[in-house]
């Protein structure tokens, strides 16, 4: 597995934070780093496989990667990221207690992926721009200024995350997408889902298409197919059982959609043929 080292990304041996744009981010094999990373998705879509679990990401997704996490990107479509790299909590001169602003693992579950709305994403861009222009001077006021900007970014993300329960349409869509991530295998009635999240059906269609480039049903199908591919690689369930587990009522229809999405049949993935080619 590829290991990325801080010496290749940070401007000096003491700098606690670095900005690394990926415009766009191509598919990238599994790796980990000796530093922490906040991944901010500007726009586009892709699959983020985080510690072996696949997540669909799009504009407004924010992922918190720790120095022992492993991850990769695949199936990317104009996926543009800004990576805010930071060494460790004890690398800062003026900041303490950062863990209170970051997602925390509880009972083996780490809420690594948050979502923010488009207006917050614009504020994030402005803060990141200030961080990029802050320079590399190591005198105390300059260091303090850069650390303050990093703290402001964490506060903004924390306040604006899904967990804060905002009520505008962007926030409602974020909540809906998080719900789909958990309930993808269930039968979905879009009229009922729209009502559940206090959105009109037309607004749901329009906003999901703007965020992901896909209609709601195509987005749901892709989500199901991603989960199915993960099970094909990492479980012993039959293709038919996986199809049903991921919300498909007919295994032949599942196989057709799967090949159309990934250019491989479920059997090819089960036998690891895609990995051999790569």
From Swiss-Prot:
**SMART domains per the UniProt record, alphabetical:** HTH_ARAC
| Site feature Interaction with sigma-70, where | 241, 250
Q: What Pfam families does its record include?
A: AraC_binding, HTH_18
Every copy of the HTH araC/xylS-type domain together lies at 174-272
Q: From the UniProt annotation, which stretches of this protein bind DNA?
A: 191-212, 239-262
Question: Its Gene Ontology biological processes?
Answer: positive regulation of DNA-templated transcription; rhamnose metabolic process
Q: What is its main location?
A: cytoplasm
Q: Which domain of life is it from?
A: Bacteria
Q: Identify the keywords attached in UniProt to this record, alphabetized.
A: Activator, Cytoplasm, DNA-binding, Repeat, Rhamnose metabolism, Transcription, Transcription regulation
The UniProt entry's GO CC annotations, sorted and at most eight, read: cytoplasm
**What are the subcellular locations of this protein?**
Cytoplasm
Q: Name one GO molecular function term.
A: DNA-binding transcription factor activity
SUPFAM superfamilies recorded: Homeodomain-like (SSF46689), Regulatory protein AraC (SSF51215)
The record's section on HAMAP family has: HTH_type_RhaS (MF_01534)
**Function comment:** Activates expression of the rhaBAD and rhaT operons.
How this chain assembles, per its entry, is:
Binds DNA as a dimer.
Protein name as annotated: HTH-type transcriptional activator RhaS
């Amino acid at each position: 597995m590829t290991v990325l080292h801080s010496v290749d990304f940070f401007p000096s041996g003491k700098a606690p934070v670095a900005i690394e744009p990926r415009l766009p981010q191509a598919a990238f094999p599994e790796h980990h780093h000796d530093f922490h990373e906040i991944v901010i998705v500007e726009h586009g879509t892709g699959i983020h496989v985080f510690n072996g679990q696949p997540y669909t990401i799009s504009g407004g997704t924010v992922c918190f990667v720790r120095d022992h996490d492993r991850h990769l990107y695949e199936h990317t479509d104009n996926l543009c990221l800004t990576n805010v790299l930071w060494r460790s909590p004890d690398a800062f001169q003026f900041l303490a207690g950062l863990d209170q602003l970051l997602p925390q693992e509880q009972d083996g579950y780490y809420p690594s992926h948050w979502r923010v709305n488009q207006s917050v994403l614009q504020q994030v861009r402005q803060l990141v721009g200030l961080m990029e222009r802050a320079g590399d001077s190591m005198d105390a006021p300059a260091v303090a200024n850069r650390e303050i900007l990093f703290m402001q970014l964490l506060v903004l993300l924390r306040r604006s995350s899904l967990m804060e329960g905002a009520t505008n349409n962007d926030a409602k869509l974020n909540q809906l997408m998080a719900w789909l991530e958990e309930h993808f295998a269930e039968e979905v009635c879009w009229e009922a889902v729209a009502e559940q999240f206090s959105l009109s059906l037309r607004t749901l269609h329009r906003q999901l298409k703007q965020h992901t480039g896909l209609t709601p049903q195509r987005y749901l199908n892709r989500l199901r197919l991603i989960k199915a591919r993960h099970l094909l690689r990492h479980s012993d369930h039959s293709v038919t059982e996986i199809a049903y587990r991921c919300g498909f009522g007919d295994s032949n229809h599942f196989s057709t959609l799967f090949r159309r999405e990934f250019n491989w049949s479920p059997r090819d993935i089960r036998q690891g043929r895609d990995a051999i080619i790569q």
